[in-house]
Amino acid sequence: MTKKSTVQFEAGISLPTFLDRFGTEAQCREVVFQQRWPHGFQRTSCGSRSHCRPDTRDLLPCNRCKHQVSPTAGTLFAQTKLPLKTWFLAIYLLSQHKNGIWAMTLSRRLGVSCNTAWLLKHKLMQAMVEGEHDRMLHGVVQMDDAYHAIKGKYLQRYLSEFCYRFNRRFDLAGLVTQLILTATRTQPLPYRLAALDA
C-alpha cells in the first residue's frame, strides 16, 4: 500500500470560495484597508484616527489635516490601473499553482496584455522576495531535474517564488491571504524598477 503525500492532498482554497471572499472590488478594498490598518485608520503624519467617508475615488480624507489617503498608497497596489479584484485573482493563480504560472497563461486567465501580466507577476514575485527575505539561500544552490531559461537579474525573484510556495505548502488555503498581506507591506514597484536587477 502506498503512502499518501500530505502535500498532494493538502486542501487549498477553491475558486468559488476565493470569489466569495474576494470577488468584488469592495471586498478587495476592505481587505487592503484591514491589512494596512489592522487597528483602525491612523494617519502617520498627523496621528489622526478619524476620516470622512471615502469619495468616489476611494480616497479617505483625514478629519484633522484634510489630506486624502488611498488605502493602496505605499503598497504594491499603489497607482495601479487594474482593479484590485484582478490583482487578487493573480495572487490566487500565482499561489495555487504548484509549479508557478507563466505570464502568458496569466495574461489569458486575467484578460490583460502579456506585458501587463509580466509586470503583475514580477511585482508579486518581488513581494515574495520580501516575504522570504529572512530565509534567503546562500552559497551554491542545486536543483534536480530543472532547467529554466531565466535571466540572471530575475533569478532571485523566481527562486523566491518557488521558496515562498514551498515553505507554505502545508497551508495552501492561507497562502493567498499571506501573499495579500505581504503585498500590502511591500513598497510600490514601478515598471522601471521591476525590469531592472531584482
Locations of regions flagged by a protein language model:
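Residue-level recognition of single "structural anchor" positions
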Residues: 1-198
